[in-house]
Swiss-Prot record:
Monomer. ATP binds at residues 205, 296, 327, 353-356. Belongs to the phosphoglycerate kinase family. It is found in: Cytoplasm. Pfam families: PGK. Signal peptide: none annotated. It comes from Campylobacter jejuni subsp. jejuni serotype O:23/36 (strain 81-176). Its EC number is 2.7.2.3. InterPro entries: Phosphoglycerate_kinase (IPR001576), Phosphoglycerate_kinase_CS (IPR015911), Phosphoglycerate_kinase_N (IPR015824), Phosphoglycerate_kinase_sf (IPR036043). This is Phosphoglycerate kinase.
Length: 400
């Protein structure tokens, strides 16, 4: 992806630099950050700017606020960032209001300003050019380091790039790393290449599954989405999650896999329970024998053994989506075991999506994976072969 303008191609000295980060981190009920991976991932780009004599304005969204609310404030992010960088972070009370503009204007070389949650401005998610213009007016250089939102045409991701020429906009280190990794994975995977796809919905991953089939050697389907495929095969799935309108599509994928010579593996047994709760009885049942009124909530031990065998000779594994309702302890075993087996092997292991990254962190396997992508939807769309709006905006025109 050498046609993407890199931060290294830009003269940053003594300039004000806007870095679009992805600080959309999980928090507990007391607003404590429970996983700061996304904040830590942004540090190399921030440090590079400081080392090159800039002043830095950071911007991000957090959650999906309907209105301005302290629950969605970036204050906790500012505190965590200050600790990680061992440096004071100036926090703006707004995004393009008087406070942000005054603080941006007075920012000196080596200082960092964090704007308040971008989504407090209604125009952010509408790709509003007026908002983009206001943000752009604070700085001389724009850097996008937020892979997790590159698939969205938002003001701070796409519209803003129209106000900078090629000498003054580019991709940060995290964004470059993510794009390079995903591109190489799709174009030159070491084989056998196995995709492990889970999560609750087929609808969200239909395009990715279709696009992956010609590229992979084997495909494992787990999680809630597996039941639509099992139903398509004529199995009785009890009260398990089902997207009835996608049964035909599921059948098409199974047929396409067969025609391409791709082995598709579905769960052979499941952990079934009458309800999705920690306090209900559970039992292991074959995938064809889920009792009426019960639902499958995790893959069972036989499926775990089968999937372990399937990935044992893999040279590349791409994993997106948990194998069960991992948030509930008794239905997390399948996902945790898959994480262990993927991380223990010799394959290049690429993990995409927030839920999957959470499983890997919970399993204690994060350091053993080759690459953990910070973007769920964005990594899916890259795998689907789509051009991401935030990335397209940073392409060098000469190479288009």
């Amino acid at each position: 992806m050498s046609d993407i303008i890199s931060i290294k191609d830009i003269d940053l000295a003594k300039k004000k630099v806007f870095i679009r980060c992805d600080f959309n981190v999980p928090q507990d009920d007391f607003l404590n950050i429970t996983d700061d991976r996304r904040i830590r991932s942004a540090i190399p780009t921030i440090r590079y700017c400081l080392d090159n004599g800039c002043s830095v304005i950071l911007a991000s969204h957090l959650g999906r606020p309907k209105e301005i609310s302290s629950k969605y404030s970036l204050e906790p992010v500012a505190k965590r960032l200050a600790r990680l960088l061992d440096k004071e972070i100036v926090m703006a009370k707004d995004v393009i209001g008087e406070d942000a503009k005054t603080k941006a204007m007075n920012l000196k070389v080596g200082e960092i300003l964090l704007l308040e949650n971008l989504r407090f401005e209604k125009g952010e998610t509408k790709n509003d050019e007026n908002l983009a213009k206001e943000l752009a007016s604070m700085v001389q250089v724009y850097i996008n380091d937020a892979f997790g939102v590159c698939h969205r045409a938002h003001s701070s991701v796409e519209a803003i790039t129209k106000f900078f020429d090629e000498k003054h906009k580019g991709a940060g280190f995290l964004l470059q790393k993510e794009i390079d990794f995903a591109s190489n994975l799709i174009k030159h995977p070491a084989r056998p290449f196995v995709a492990v796809v889970g999560g609750s919905k087929v609808s969200g991953k239909l395009q990715a599954l279709t696009n992956l089939l010609p590229k992979v050697d084997k495909l494992i389907i787990g999680g809630g989405m597996a039941f639509t495929f099992l139903k398509a095969l004529g199995y009785d799935i009890g009260n398990s999650l089902l997207e009835e309108e996608l049964l035909e599509e599921a059948n098409k994928i199974l047929t396409k896999g067969k025609n391409l010579g791709v082995k598709i593996y579905l769960p052979v047994d499941v952990v079934a329970a009458p309800a999705c709760s920690q306090d209900v009885p559970m039992k292991f049942v074959p995938a064809q024998e889920i009792p009426n009124g019960w639902m499958g909530l995790d893959i069972g031990p036989a499926s775990v053994r089968l999937f372990k065998e399937v990935i044992s000779d893999a040279q590349t594994i791409w994993w997106n989506g948990p194998m069960g309702v991992f948030e509930i302890d008794k239905f997390s075993k399948g996902s945790i075991k898959m994480s262990h087996y993927i991380s223990e092997g010799h394959a290049t292991s690429v993990v995409g999506g927030g839920d999957t990254a959470d499983v890997v962190a919970r399993a204690g396997d994060a350091d053993e994976m080759t690459f953990i992508s910070t973007g769920g939807g964005a990594s899916l769309e890259l795998i689907e072969g789509k051009e991401l709006p935030g990335v397209k905006a940073l392409r060098s025109k000469e190479n288009e």
